[in-house]
């Protein structure tokens, strides 16, 4: 172990951002009109040797918001049936789901001494656009742990 890795933390490795891998499943491409149906978040942590490892995953099955568009082709692609009784038994409303996820991420973020989370994903701005629309719909801006526009995108 070098002196560099001994003092390296996830906070100073990523400029005080905690990387969180995010994946969403949606009912279309428009974050303002189409439902966000599922979200999963996995914080990326770092051990004392400077190796990255996944933190505990947190996820939610989300009930479509009132008036949400459910594109048939998107549902066929994802295989999600938002009207399935089994899914309805575990699905949460948007506000409950996102605030539960943010509460967990806040705890992890604070334990790593990071100031914000940064969304990591494949085509990350797509996921972030749905997350930001959900934040706006649920008036959860003050609870959000994510940077509003910066991402780490695995496509690029």
Features from the language model and the residues they span:
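Short alpha-helix plus adjacent loop in nuclease-associated cores
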Residues: 151-156
